[in-house]
Amino acid sequence: MTNNSLLLTESKVWIKRKDAPGEVVRVIPDMESNGRVTAYQLYTAFEQNPDYLGQILFDNEGYWIYDGDILTVAEQEQVARFILKGEG
């Protein structure tokens, strides 16, 4: 997988939660100096002072890892799928 299909602009994604209301998450690409995106910062979407939800980091193969402790595995997977589609 190449980095070309990853999300390149700030976007919002709706995540479904198992035992709580869903939430909209703001996804912000973190560009490297060479223009490649390797990480995405995650925040609550509509608050004046948004809460930081962690980050998702990608390698050149399209594998990802979540760096944070707020999102469940299912929620992480929803955000990662959204990013991998490259749509926003």
State each model region's role.
Residues 1-42:
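Negatively charged, low-complexity tracts enriched in Asp/Glu with abundant Ser/Thr
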Residues 33-57:
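Short, contiguous, helix-prone interaction/anchoring segments in small proteins
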